[in-house]
């Protein structure tokens, strides 16, 4: 499998993991996490549809331990 395909697979897996976590929450908790859910969904769509990956980006994503989408979200809100 090409590295770029592995990047997309990792992002797909991370998004599926995030969705699974969110579906386990109560309706009230989902409401509280609405902005995070929206933001991570948008990040997911950008990274899978509109982002042009450099070799360094590919390496960063593939070497990242943990949920890459949540990390991007966290870094974005910390700005």
Residue ranges and their predicted role:
Residues 1-79:
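Acidic interaction surfaces
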